């Protein structure tokens, strides 16, 4: 089916974002160890891309080969384009690592020792390490009729070994497989006295290639090659059939490691007959094979910056600030009573959010706490505070999203711990992931000489995750505004109970009012532009894909509305097309921190409506998730959001990329004055 207006391909857009991430590794202004980290981040992103998006594309081709993508391409054509671009990206990534980053690291005394250049002393150390630390954990599998090719785990490091000779039972040995357990280190530090470098490292693959013969005694090792298989990692839970989501999910999680293969990675020097065998065993074609120079898993190199104590090769450390309104208050409740508080992470600390919950857990006046959890990590002081509150007799209700991708197991564990201390745990609404970020605290206070209940709320654009709060840009609002607090109470009521849709005063909520309000706000700007009034839309988000929103934005451009979009990742809208979108610009900011806040600005004939949200403008966020968008009404806070969240990004000429009408991005070039959104905010807020 052809589309009525132009859209860009989602998968190609995701790869485009990863190209921008990889460009950070080529930027000489980025510290060297951080450049290595960006290469690793690209690998991690590609892993998820193959596990989810490519797996889905392959499934669609199998199930409905004649179907078309939303942008009007046949599935097979789209797949071919995506594979070609992914191959180019991987090649560029490894070329950058081996020709630029590793040589630069060597100049700084950080070196990876290859097994074919070990000295006698290094060889002896490596042999001892292999025999003592690796060999006892490894299990060789010889391939014969009694030992078929094993179904190796998703993203595990494996070695295929060509053998010659007969084993103890007289069987002719041809091939063996060794899977490296995840518990084994992928990078081992060589003693400095042996290395000759300040920081010398040996990859696990180097140990294996040199000593794998120890696993196959009295056989000749003809070759040893590493490989890695990526599998479909989407979980299937039939939401119409299940009676207990947590139990169903626990039964499904182990299968994630053994889903259908979607990608094979091999070292570039792997013999072709070995590659063919691996492809056959995996059910993959030649296009699905990625030949790389060196290690097949660069994600594990992410630990190198942490192992190397070289502050001069890393981003400058910073201390996030605490707003004076909080620093000067006796308690968080006193601070919020004085007025709404806006927090801009990571420039302002996430600690006040933790302190609000910790104080609530210990405050005898607090009677109830309600909290949503999407991602929070395996070691979370926020979850500790919720459990403390439950142990202290508070009415604690936690909406835990069990289907947060790749955090399912962590969230199941937290749900069990919360229930064990008496908290009420619910899993939201089946069929609608709860992605909204909400905290509601109910406290008994004295007012006019009598006790009354007062609500306090925290709403955010990002997760309740202390670690990512230092890595992602997000806004959070603390308020005791009666209407907002009542709205949050109603949303929790919907999530935990059963009943009809409740009217909200201030919040826009998906899957009910968020999409209609966005469309309505765009149409107001269209009407104002047609009436000769000033009209403007500025929106910042991670992704823009929803067709009816894109259609409305195209119509806005045609009506003369100036539209500036700041979309970090994939954007299906084509900007700058004459007669369609010449009044629309699309920028992407890629820098030290992951741009994560969602901000919607509508000029509204001078009223300037500003909303913060956890929702991207995507089908899933607007129709298949529980999300909220909340207004920033207080004038000073509104100016802050506009200035810190939007204006600095629109003015950035160092870390910003501008989308062209063909979907490709060009880096904005600095003029006489360099403007970097993130560095400017660091300088403003942090010490």
From Swiss-Prot:
Any single GO BP term: polyphosphate biosynthetic process
Family matches, as Pfam families: PP_kinase, PP_kinase_C, PP_kinase_C_1, PP_kinase_N
The keyword Transit peptide appears for this protein: no
Catalytic activity: [phosphate](n) + ATP = [phosphate](n+1) + ADP
Domain of life: Bacteria
GO molecular function: ATP binding; metal ion binding; polyphosphate kinase activity
Active-site residues, as the UniProt record annotates them: 435
Binding site for ATP: 45, 472, 568, 596
Cofactors: Mg(2+)
Binding site for Mg(2+): 375, 405
InterPro entries: PP_kinase, PP_kinase_C_1, PP_kinase_middle, PP_kinase_middle_dom_sf, PPK_C_dom2, PPK_N_dom, PPK_N_dom_sf
UniProtKB keywords: ATP-binding, Kinase, Magnesium, Metal-binding, Nucleotide-binding, Phosphoprotein, Transferase
Post-translational modification note: An intermediate of this reaction is the autophosphorylated ppk in which a phosphate is covalently linked to a histidine residue through a N-P bond.
EC code(s) of this entry: 2.7.4.1
The keyword Metal-binding is annotated on this UniProt entry: yes
GO CC terms: polyphosphate kinase complex
Assigned protein family: Belongs to the polyphosphate kinase 1 (PPK1) family.
Function text: Catalyzes the reversible transfer of the terminal phosphate of ATP to form a long-chain polyphosphate (polyP).
Protein name stated in the entry: Polyphosphate kinase
